[in-house]
Structure formats: C-alpha cells, structure tokens
Swiss-Prot record:
Residues 1-59 form a transit peptide. It is found in: Plastid, Chloroplast. Disulfide bonds: none annotated. Belongs to the PAP/fibrillin family. GO terms for cellular component: chloroplast. It holds the Pfam family PAP_fibrillin. Residues 18-36 have a biased composition (Low complexity). Residues 17-39 are annotated as: Disordered. May stabilize the accumulated carotenoid structures. InterPro entries: PAP, PAP/fibrillin_dom. This is Plastid lipid-associated protein 2, chloroplastic. Expressed almost exclusively in petals. Very weak expression in all other organs.
Amino acid sequence: MATVQFFNQFPCKTRVQSSANSKPLSKPPSSLVPMSALTRRPSFPPGEFAVSRSDFRVRVIDAEDELDPETSEGGGSALLMAEEAIESVEETEVLKRSLVDSLYGTDRGLSASSETRAEIGDLITQLESKNPTPAPTDALFLLNGKWILAYTSFVGLFPLLSRGIVPLVKVDEISQTIDSDNFTVENSVLFAGPLATTSISTNAKFEIRSPKRVQIKFEEGVIGTPQLTDSIEIPEYVEFLGQKIDLTPIRGLLTSVQDTATSVARTISSQPPLKFSLPGDSAQSWLLTTYLDKDIRISRGDGGSVFVLIKEGSPLLNP
C-alpha cells in the first residue's frame, strides 16, 4: 500500500481522443508523465520519507534442536519433562514387579536366605527413593482398605510363621485393614487347618503424628470362631518312604473320624468370637510409611523392621 500511495503522488490527466478534422499534436503535452519516470527507481532528497522492504530471516533447526530446552521457548522443555515423568513411572513399575518376584518362595520372609534378604532390601531402598506419596498421612484414601503382608524382617513374627507351631495348621494370611474414616486398624492372622479356618486379630486406634508416622494404640484382641472348609477327600493310597500304602481298608474309619471332627467344628463355629484385653505397656506402637501407592505399601516399625504389604485386589498378588 505504501508503494501505491507513492505512485498516487504523481499528477495524471486523461488523454482526450482528437476528432478526424483536428490536427495531430506535434509533441506530447507537458502534463503527461514519460514511461521512463515510472520505471526508473525514484530517488529522494535528504530528509524525505522512504519506504524500505522488511528483512526476513529464516533459521533451520533439526529435531534435536527442537527438543532442546535452551533453544525452544517452552514447548520443548515441557515435552522433555513429560518424557522424564513417564520414564520415572516406568522405572517404578519395573522395581515393583522385581520386588514382588524376589519375594516368591520366601514365606513372607521366614525362608529367605541372606542373599535374598540383601536383594530385597536393595529393591526396597530404591522404591523408597521414588515414593510418589511423600506425605502418606495426607493421602488417607490410599491407606484405606485391606493390605496383605508379603514380606517382613520382623523376627517377632517368625515363630508364628513357622509351620511346626501347631500340627496340620498353617498361617494362611496376615493382613492389616485400615479404616481412615474412623481411624482404626485391624491386624489379623488367618489360620487354616484340615477342616476349618480361624483367625486371631487385634483392634487398634491410630493418631497422625507426622506426614509419614502414625501412633497405634491397641485396644483388644479377638479370636474368631472357626469357619468350616470343604470336606477332605480321602485318597485311595498314600506314599510313605517310597512305599504305597493302600487306604481302602481304613477309609470307613477315616470317614467316621472326619464326620466327628466336622460335628465338633460346627458346634464351635456357632459360638461368638472370644475377645480379650491387651496389657497397657505393650499395647502401643508406631508405624512409619516410607512408600505408598495404589498397589504397594512399605512401612517400618520399632527397631527398624520393614513390612511390605500389597493392596487386596492388586494384580501384583497374582504372580
């Protein structure tokens, strides 16, 4: 538009066509502008306004420069941060799976060798350094629910985990259920026998003492009534010291014993749970949560003992 305005400054008159009787002009009128004036680059005396063409500079960059936070305005930096966050999450998931795999066959820590314990301890430390919930007590919705004990270094539980403590009875599950609405904790041990299961649990209240630590005060213990399991199927034979022993002659006797035991178990099952109080001196403890997400919780208790728990319903419970 500046060029058009520049050309409009020149005077211009319309040329009138002469009639047939008129004489041709001997020379062009002085008011007409010669073509050379239109094609010649105009010059401006000093101080006059001149229009210049803008300069355009083009910079070629490659893909690496585009992702460099120093050369990009902000998009590259945001993309780099997003990629780092995704990579961190993937590393955490790999660590979680590696930890769960290393727990296989340890019987919650009872049967773990010293080498396995060292490997588990290293994986726990790595996970704690990537804790996505720095203040677990501010995220009670994650703490809420039932947690299954997968591993512990607490030697006080080892006698309980030992299979020889009661013949034919094993520890089927150890769990902790947290109700963040009522600030209660239930620790439960489920025992499984040939005909029934039963549980021993403790009920407690907890108080928040820091972003990671809660104080626990146990109130009572409960011995649950046995729950009947399916009947035992008596095999035709068993192997003992490499010899097959035929059970057919005594299957009737074994069936009679089983029926009697079932009758006794039904009688016991109809009774209410047995509750008992806990001594005041040993009824308090504290718990420090060092890692927490929707699947895994790592806590440390008195004396530095560590507990690895997996949330009920998590796919990590299915190896």
